[in-house]
């Protein structure tokens, strides 16, 4: 599958990352988490992160609220770090982009995105809505 081709070893069902128990701590599972969803899924990540682990948050697709307690931060020393893509200084962006293009570059990065022209965009949007596109679509205005 597409995800296996990217090196994925296991797909975690949403039920495992959306704890509705109300408990302030869960079984420590993760050393680190990159969250793009927010809400209770982010809280589940926080309360199931191992001692000294870190969570980054860069989105709020599910919710921008965080129904959390401070216990994971105090008892496990968990760190929550917000990723700001708006105010990030250009010199910092360039350093990170250079690393992504160099030493951090994925072997199969071409599989993550495809290009389309502006004229092809409506067709691509329809395909995305039908679930027929995997990865990202980049509009190349020069094409």
Where do the language-model regions lie?
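C-terminal hydrophobic helical "lid"/dimerization subdomain
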Residues: 94-143
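Terminal peptide-recognition signature
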Residues: 3, 33, 45, 80, ...
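Glycine-rich phosphate-binding loop and adjacent beta-alpha segment
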Residues: 40-106
